[in-house]
A protein has these predicted regions:
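Bacterial N-terminal signal peptides that target proteins for export
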Residues: 2-10
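N-terminal signal peptide c-region/cleavage motif recognized by signal peptidases
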Residues: 18-21
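N-terminal cap/lid segment of alpha/beta-hydrolase-fold proteins
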Residues: 24-57
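Short, surface-exposed "cap/lid" segments of acyl-processing enzymes
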Residues: 48, 55-94, 98
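Cap/lid segment of the alpha/beta-hydrolase catalytic domain
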Residues: 100-124
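Alpha/beta-hydrolase active-site loop
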Residues: 116-140
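Primarily recognizes the serine-hydrolase "nucleophile elbow" in alpha/beta-hydrolase
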Residues: 145-191
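The feature captures the conserved acid-bearing segment of alpha/beta-hydrolase catalytic domains
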Residues: 181-240
Length: 240
């Protein structure tokens, strides 16, 4: 690991050592009339995302973690008793938002945005929807550092937010990112018969030059990951 990446990962850890802040209600209403209160919905009058705020006991940080799930998931990530968002909140002891990505459906409702069968949805429009939601979360949690964490497809979206709306978060963590979308789709076709070109999706690798050099961003991927191969993350890091 290069010193640059070690420094960035260290910055993520430092965020977890700060104290907590209070949320503020902005009174924004979602398109469905529900309040964008930072508890079950967040966004703007144009589009809102469904969310679940997980508050671990004795959370003593000034960090708000936001977790974006991968493709073909989302439902389990809105639970308060298990799932990746719950684990993140529990391990870091920080308030954590489980964010339902644009177009996804859950028991709490459907997030606004485009979703074609939970495929080919890393679109410019969806990236903007996420950035709008993050901007409102900042308003609802003044004084907190915002850590955006994405897994798999959520990691791809996280990388795209970092490129197109870099002020959306104070730090970014991409886990198992399919960061080079066209080769990843080819790989999924050959390895699992689940490929097909995604004409509507942006590729984080292509957008990487837009990420400001000062951005705190880190990637993690398992050496045995047979879906989002390590080389897709490595290629992205090399482009930053």
């Amino acid at each position: 690991m290069s010193p640059r990446w070690a420094k960035r990962i260290g910055a993520l850890a430092l965020f977890a050592l700060m104290g907590a802040a209070q949320a503020v209600d902005t009174g924004v209403k979602c398109p469905n009339g529900q309040p964008a209160d930072g508890v079950l919905h967040v966004g703007s009058e144009r589009h809102c995302l469904v969310m679940r705020l997980i508050e671990p006991a004795q959370a003593q940080t000034q960090v708000l973690a936001v977790f974006m799930h991968g493709d073909n998931s989302g439902r389990s990530e809105l639970r308060t008793d298990r799932g990746n968002a719950f684990t993140l909140a529990d391990k870091l002891r920080v308030s954590t938002v489980a964010l339902l990505r644009p177009g996804y459906q859950s028991e709490l409702g459907r997030s606004d945005g485009y979703n074609l069968g939970r495929d080919d949805d890393y679109t410019a429009g969806n990236v903007e929807v996420v950035a709008t939601a993050l901007a409102q979360l900042r308003q609802l949690h003044p004084g907190k550092k915002l850590l955006l964490v994405g897994h798999s497809g959520g990691a791809a979206m996280t990388g795209l937010v970092a490129a197109r709306f870099p002020q959306s978060a104070d730090a970014y963590l991409l886990a198992a990112c399919p960061c080079d979308v066209p080769p990843w789709r080819e790989w999924r076709q050959s390895s699992a018969g689940r490929g097909g070109f995604w004409p509507n999706s942006l590729s984080p690798l292509a957008e990487a030059p837009k990420v400001p050099v000062s951005t705190r961003i880190a990637l993690i991927v398992g050496s045995q990951d047979d879906n989002t191969l390590p080389r897709f993350s490595e290629a992205y890091v090399a482009r930053l």
